[in-house]
Regions:
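A compositional/biophysical signature of low hydrophobicity enriched in polar/charged and small residues
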Residues: 1-75
Length: 75
C-alpha cells in the first residue's frame, strides 16, 4: 500500500533527515516542503499494521522529529 508521511522537525536540518529516511526500505522518495510541514516521504508498505509499526518505530523515534501525520492513498 502507498502512503505519505508529513514530518515537522524540531530543527531545520532537512537534508540530514532526508538522507536517513531514504536509507529505509519503506521510503520510496522524500522531499523538502515549505510551510507547516518540513518533509514529505512517499512510503510503500504491505498493510496498515506495517505502516503503523513503521511510523512508531522508525519515524517518531528520530530525535529531530517534532510531529508527523500519515496520509494513506485510496486509489
Amino acid at each position: 500500500m502507498k502512503a505519505f508521511a508529513l514530518i515537522s522537525l524540531k530543527s531545520c536540518d532537512e537534508k540530514k533527515i532526508i538522507d536517513k529516511l531514504v536509507e529505509l526500505p519503506e521510503v520510496q522518495n522524500a522531499y523538502v516542503l515549505f510551510g507547516e510541514w518540513d518533509i514529505i516521504a512517499e512510503l510503500n508498505v504491505e498493510n496498515s499494521e506495517e505502516l503503523g509499526t513503521f511510523m512508531m518505530e522508525k519515524i517518531r523515534t528520530i530525535p529531530e522529529v517534532k510531529l508527523s501525520s500519515t496520509l494513506i492513498v485510496a486509489k
